[in-house]
Design a protein with these regions (language model features):
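N-terminal positively charged helical leader segments and presequences
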Residues: 1-103
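Glycine- and other small-residue-rich loops at beta-strand/loop junctions that grip anionic moieties
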Residues: 3, 30, 129-130, 155-156
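Amphipathic alpha-helical repeat scaffolds
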Residues: 34, 132-140
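Hydrophobic residues within beta-strands of alpha/beta enzymes
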Residues: 55, 152-153
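Acidic/glycine-rich phosphate/pyrophosphate-binding loops and surrounding catalytic core
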Residues: 96-99, 103-121
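Conserved small/polar residues in nucleotide/adenosyl-binding loops
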Residues: 159
């Protein structure tokens, strides 16, 4: 199917998911953009690890990234009625990025549980939460290794 309007509900949803954490939490969805990211996402969907809500692509992107894109998995990772061709002009309006690659997805969030079986009850762990300066991560990891911690647990905003 073809979408031409920025007022299309799915295009509006994509833009909202891209810019709003609240929207991502409310809808249980997140936005993916770029050829490589979408190929990786399609692979995960074909393997059954995630579920794709919608795919958007331009003909220009299919031509430009033909060596990167595996169009069979890109188009088979969701139902055919959820795959949309869009114009180059609309692609530029879907993202705030200056150089749109013309490939986008809306994907259902996956809740990943904390796996307690990997934690040694007698171990010492460094827990990093809300790390403000990722540049400090290397120093923290080297220090943790030097003092013999069993592992590092890091939190992050996945979506």
């Amino acid at each position: 199917m073809h979408i031409n309007s920025k007022d299309n509900p799915r295009v509006k949803l994509f833009r909202k998911l891209l810019s709003s954490k609240k929207a991502r939490e409310e809808h249980g969805l997140f936005a993916v953009e770029g050829a490589r990211n979408c190929v990786d996402t399609a692979y995960e969907a074909v393997c059954g690890r995630i579920k794709v809500h919608s795919v958007f692509y331009t003909q220009t992107a299919l031509t430009k990234y033909k060596n990167t894109l595996k169009t069979d998995s890109l188009f088979s990772c969701t139902r055919p009625e959820d795959v949309f061709e869009i114009s180059d002009e609309l692609a530029k309006k879907m993202t705030d990025e200056g150089n749109s690659q013309g490939i986008y997805m809306i994907v259902f969030k996956v809740d990943l549980p904390f796996v307690a079986e990997y934690i040694d009850k007698n171990g010492k762990y460094l827990v990093l939460d809300n790390l403000q300066d990722p540049g400090n991560l290397g120093t923290l990891l080297r220090t943790a290794d030097a003092v013999g911690v069993s592992g590092v647990v890091m939190t992050c905003l996945l979506y």
